[in-house]
C-alpha cells in the first residue's frame, strides 16, 4: 500500500512542479523574481502543504534571494488559484517557497575539486 501512495505522491509532486514552473514563466511578471527555476517539490503526506524549492538566475545576493522568496510567497494564493483550475485535486496544497541552495553548494564543491586537480597537476610537473 505504501508503494502506491508514494507513487501517487511522487506523480502529484512532479505535476505541481511542472505547473508552477509554467505559472512562473507565463503569469508572474515581477522583475524582482526574474528568471526562476522550480527545482523540486516536497509534498506533505496528506497533500495539504508543499515546499516549493526554487532558484533564481542572476539573483545571487541574500537580499535578492530574500526579495524573490517574499514575492513568491505573497503570490502563493494566486498560484494556488491557477493550480486549482488546472489540476484535478480535492485539496490544493498550501505553497511555501524555499530557496534551493544545492546548486550553489554543488558549484562550491566543483570549484574545490577543480582547484585540487590544478594543485596536483602543478606538483607532478
Swiss-Prot record:
PROSITE patterns: RBFA
Coiled coil spans: none
A Gene Ontology cellular-component term: cytosol
Matches recorded under SUPFAM superfamilies: Ribosome-binding factor A, RbfA
Main location: cytoplasm
The entry's keywords: Cytoplasm, Ribosome biogenesis
Gene3D superfamilies: 3.30.300.20
UniProt-listed InterPro entries: KH_dom-like_a/b, RbfA, RbfA_dom_sf, Ribosome-bd_factorA_CS
Pfam families attached to this UniProt entry: RBFA (PF02033)
Single annotated GO MF: ribosomal small subunit binding
Keyword DNA repair carried by entry: no
Xref: HAMAP family: RbfA
Summary of the function given for this chain in its UniProt record: One of several proteins that assist in the late maturation steps of the functional core of the 30S ribosomal subunit. Associates with free 30S ribosomal subunits (but not with 30S subunits that are part of 70S ribosomes or polysomes). Required for efficient processing of 16S rRNA. May interact with the 5'-terminal helix region of 16S rRNA.
Family per similarity comment: Belongs to the RbfA family.
Record's subunit section: Monomer. Binds 30S ribosomal subunits, but not 50S ribosomal subunits or 70S ribosomes.
The name this protein goes by in its record: Ribosome-binding factor A
Organism: Wigglesworthia glossinidia brevipalpis
Organism phylogeny: Bacteria, Pseudomonadati, Pseudomonadota, Gammaproteobacteria, Enterobacterales
Amino acid at each position: 500500500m505504501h508503494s502506491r501512495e508514494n507513487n501517487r505522491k511522487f506523480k502529484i509532486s512532479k505535476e505541481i512542479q511542472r505547473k508552477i514552473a509554467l505559472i512562473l514563466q507565463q503569469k508572474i511578471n515581477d522583475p524582482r523574481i526574474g528568471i526562476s527555476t522550480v527545482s523540486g517539490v516536497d509534498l506533505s503526506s496528506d497533500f495539504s502543504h508543499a515546499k516549493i524549492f526554487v532558484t533564481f538566475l542572476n539573483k545571487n545576493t541574500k537580499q535578492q534571494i530574500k526579495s524573490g522568496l517574499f514575492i513568491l510567497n505573497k503570490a502563493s494564493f494566486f498560484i494556488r488559484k491557477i493550480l486549482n483550475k488546472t489540476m484535478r485535486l480535492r485539496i490544493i496544497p498550501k505553497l511555501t517557497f524555499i530557496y534551493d541552495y544545492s546548486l550553489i553548494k554543488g558549484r562550491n564543491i566543483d570549484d574545490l575539486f577543480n582547484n585540487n586537480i590544478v594543485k596536483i597537476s602543478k606538483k607532478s610537473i
